[in-house]
């Protein structure tokens, strides 16, 4: 007799089933796109659906290789600032001004020497991440836990092999090598960019956040990076496993040695934390000529399983060294448009205008909500949106000292905005947020690219395409585009406007047109009719009709609305918190994407250890099921103005819900601003 399940239980089961269908097909699609180097489609999937955690170490380097902010970088400076009174740049005291100078200070003109004792401070910040190697209060074997371990050659025949592996206790020397490699990556960045950016602790946490998903080679300082080093042939690659998960006991409660083959000569095993699991990796390599898997890549595949048949399709050689990839990630996170140039251009255009009103109000016209502003502007917008969207929460929290903006590097707003969630967000949530940052792409024409990168003097539009470039792209990408045929931060008619053109050179000119087009009772302008593009997900056999949707606004502005959505998601909880609890929440945001994370962890839980056959592309039935379940929320009309904020499904713990909420907040807030403006 079958058990009767409640409608809610059945609904939850079906939701999990559909999510697993989607995730499995997303993994297969991503692997196919990686194989054919279709970075445009990979970027689309990253910013909309997110990169599967099993594949970030492969996808992120591709996204950063072609990221516009890496090809033409410009980062915020903490060494100089613009003085509007003197109309000139002034030097800022560096962050370490309170530190006593050392002998190195006299040699600061040497390009190979950093001012002050930077390296020791970097090491101090990095060591905060790792657990203590000794615990006087306890003498159990669990006291010697850490976030990394010595890599070991292992068999990689299938996912179940990794599940039964054991871990060797890491040595202090090996841990020091990892920290040293992280430090060297930061030092290399500073040596290149120190004239405009001095060291901040955020760099250490950005490096650590990257190391949680991308393998580092801890002996890089002794053995130079070689692109022939394979993730699977070199046993010393390491992926950090996170610092904010409690140590759990194993199922059998045994912290000693597990049963292993007689060929395993090392019996000194211990358990260490990896994600939310204690995990053991066996050093037995019984299969002849089996490839070597990095110890903590095995951790990654234990935490987020990936069958061997799929892993075997991945490239094994890294595109970048860890230090090179860290530089590119830092360039994206610290990116800032040239605000001084923007003010000058706006002023010159205002002076050339015959309108005296435009000339007198050129400063008020600089409101780069779409194209992006500096950190000061981002902070201003964050609190402006916060007070407008969540007034009940904003008022009591602003009375608490924990929410006050601060210049301290320990301020939560520093970690949220300037460091894009480093340190403050959980590893899983931060990875998803960084997917969005790395997947950001404007429309592939120079006018639009220069609208966002106003300082750019490089031609790069030939690197990007508005159609999928992989083989059989209709079969692989059509359904994915149909499911998410608009950028999450769409706004009515914004996608049809030629950003950066002579008609729309600045944000305020775009705002004027948006008001004109969306005014109640207004009619569609001729320009709108001429520039309206067909839906990317429209059914057509013509390849040119299969268009990728591109990003509508600056990625750092997107993060502002995502963070506001996080506050709204936890609004009732925060209203009940004491000040200390609020401070803890802001500086250590609880895991937000439990549903997504659990789905990826259990994705291949019920599959056979060895998959006999895999589809070459997503199955029609699976994608049809996925499409039918997603069209209601994801397939949104680009001209829909009924903007609602908030819903009753706050317990889903799904990033898609958070992203949709952020998009709703963006549209509601911007429309309110446009209605109240004098444009």
From Swiss-Prot:
- Give the subcellular location: Cytoplasm
* Primary localization class, coarse: cytoplasm
Query: Which keywords does the record carry?
Result: Cytoplasm
Q: SMART domains attached here?
A: TBC
Q: Which domain of life is it from?
A: Eukaryota
Q: What GO cellular component term, any one, is given?
A: cytoplasm
Function, in words = Required for replication of brome mosaic virus (BMV), a positive-strand RNA virus.
Recite the other comments: Present with 12500 molecules/cell in log phase SD medium.
Protein name, UniProt field? Oxidant-induced cell-cycle arrest protein 5
What species is this protein from? Answer: Saccharomyces cerevisiae (strain ATCC 204508 / S288c) (Baker's yeast)
